[in-house]
Amino acid sequence: MKRIVFATNNQHKLQEIRDILGSSYEVVSLKEIGCDVDIPETGNTLEENALQKAQYVYDHYHVSCFADDTGLEVEALDGAPGVHSARYAEGTDHDSEANMAKLLRELNGKENRQARFRTVICYIEKQDVCPCGCTSIKKIHQFEGIVNGHIATEKHGTEGFGYDPIFVPEDYDKSFAELGEEIKNGISHRARAVAKLVEYLKMK
């Protein structure tokens, strides 16, 4: 089994990634490598945030690792909440209920409710230059996953996390929270980004 470090201590995201990757990989969290730091996310884009987190782990622990950042991009709001999705409601940090309430208020009365979830994964690969491992170089790779859909007028379902109760993926009439983990993990933005990461890893 291959071991790979995922730069997160978010148990929801960690379990989702483990479910997607299955038994082929041992996915290790930040806590499991001794990192309890809340790595800052100060980038202006999902790409910058994912790189920032992966770079921190690589610099401090010298291991191959990957990090992700995800944003919900709503067409009628010019792409908001986007990179600020986790902290969309002012004065809150990862408060999903407050974030959803704010988004529903802002879309109240709007006909266009088209939206998409976008995940960017940054994988920093440590490559040993000599057999003893005394010298190494890093390679940076980025993978993107997108799922289109629309925002419901109210919450539906109890599974999942984040904006799942109000996001209805394309070609479905139920929210992510209603579809359940098995279906969501097969079609989600994160699953699509992870699939591209796995495709790359299999070539190694």
Regions inferred by a protein language model and the residue ranges of each:
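Anionic-ligand binding patches
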Residues: 2-5, 11-204
